[in-house]
Amino acid sequence: HHNTDAFGDTAPQDICISSTYWMMGPAWLCTHFWTHYEYTGDREFLKKIFPVMLEAALFYLDFLVEKDGVLVMCPSVSPENTYRLPNGQQGAVSYGVTMDNQILRDLFSQCIKAGEILEGTDFSAHLKEMEVMENCGEFIDKIVDACGKLSPTQIGSDGRIKEWMEEYEECEPGHRHISHLYGLYPSRQISVDKTPELAEAAKKTLETRLRLGGGHTGWSRAWIINFYARLHDGESAYHNIELMLEQSTYSNLFDRHPPFQIDGNFGVVSGIAEMLLQSDEESVRLLPALPGAWKNGSVKGLRIAGGGSVSMEWKDGHLDRCVIEAGNPMKRVIRYGDTADEIMLASGKTEWNPVLC
């Protein structure tokens, strides 16, 4: 729930239906557990938090219902946003909202991966506490089945990512929330390399939202920087950094919502890192969204998925030197511009030069 507190208060908090009935907080928080494991490879940590992930999955498995051959959350809302019905009435509650599907796809797929990594570990006591009758493998099979039945991210007739299952008219077309692009960032479900059609639709979604007044809060502007970084659009990402500093930053450098919200500060730092380096379990992309304003520069110790870090130097807008320090041996495709070089990274430092590919 969006407002669960230390005292166990999980009741709807107020009359703002479009936020009060958002129930994806636990699933999103669980993805942070996985991200920590993904970047550290800490198996003991994964073993410790896996039961939490399973319990979150259990809740959503119980909550999902079938609609037109797919599993959907119902009731469901797109956080703080509303739509207009054909009769002119304003609505918020729906079913199978895009953000819900994307978050659940992350949670379920991460539970599946964690189950594979921890295969053979006994979680029977935890499952018994959860009142799950199956063994861990059988329960994971249920998650696999449900994950395959989630509605995919859809493109509307106007070429944008659909926010709701239905193509509703938006009450506020320039809304600060762009929740249906969760799949672009922080998730990796939408990418320029693997899902170009969805990436193009995400770009159009973003451009339309901004043209109509979006990005007017600091945290929203920070999210937009990350979106453009994932779209490999360094100039747009940099432009939004400028807007962030000009319009959404106090003199003490606190993010301006208004008032102060620290997620804007964290988000812009994340966006800058994403402009310089992006990675997943298969590849490492160097300088994916380098703007012209950063003609020369260097960065040290940016973390990569799988455990390790990257340090780089660039001159005149081109990569000059790259050192990858892997925490353990792993195969990765190193991407820079149009270059894609599959290499086996040994533990320790590896110097990579695109000229030698």
Regions found by a protein language model. Give the residues of each.
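Primarily short, surface-exposed interaction patches in extracytoplasmic proteins
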Residues: T35-A57, D62, E66, M73-P79, ...
